[in-house]
Amino acid sequence: MATVNQLVRKPRAPKVDKTNVPALAACPQKRGVCTRVYTTTPKKPNSALRKVARVRLTNGFEVTSYIGGEGHNLQEHSVILIRGGRVKDLPGVRYHTVRGALDCAGVSERRQGRSKYGAKRPKS
């Protein structure tokens, strides 16, 4: 335990918590422009072609963002919104694309969990 004199000389350093989404800079979402849209393969033991986009954000960061849902309309120069949330089987992918916002269309024919994919309520 430190003495009072020691604490006067050198106060206790506050704990620094590390963020998992540094590019968001404490914002809930960030806007960016797609610089490359491509597919990549997941780690073992999974197998698929996962859709991802390389995005240049408004704050200058360049990050990789996962595009969830079946099918998408993104291409180079599309303006998208990203949020935090990593993809466990894709190393280096720490962000998700927000479907149904800006240039990214929602998932068509989506019936359940629609709010996560920007799909409107279907006409019954």
UniProtKB/Swiss-Prot annotation:
Gene Ontology CC annotation, any one: small ribosomal subunit
3-methylthioaspartic acid: modified positions: 89
MF terms in GO: rRNA binding; structural constituent of ribosome; tRNA binding
Record keywords, A-Z: Methylation, Ribonucleoprotein, Ribosomal protein, RNA-binding, rRNA-binding, tRNA-binding
InterPro entries assigned: NA-bd_OB-fold, Ribosomal_uS12, Ribosomal_uS12_bac
Biological-process GO terms, alphabetical: translation
PANTHER family in UniProt: 30S RIBOSOMAL PROTEIN S12 FAMILY MEMBER
Record function comment: With S4 and S5 plays an important role in translational accuracy.
HAMAP family: Ribosomal_uS12_B (MF_00403_B)
Similarity annotation: Belongs to the universal ribosomal protein uS12 family.
Subunit structure: Part of the 30S ribosomal subunit. Contacts proteins S8 and S17. May interact with IF1 in the 30S initiation complex.
Protein name: Small ribosomal subunit protein uS12
Organism: Shewanella pealeana (strain ATCC 700345 / ANG-SQ1)
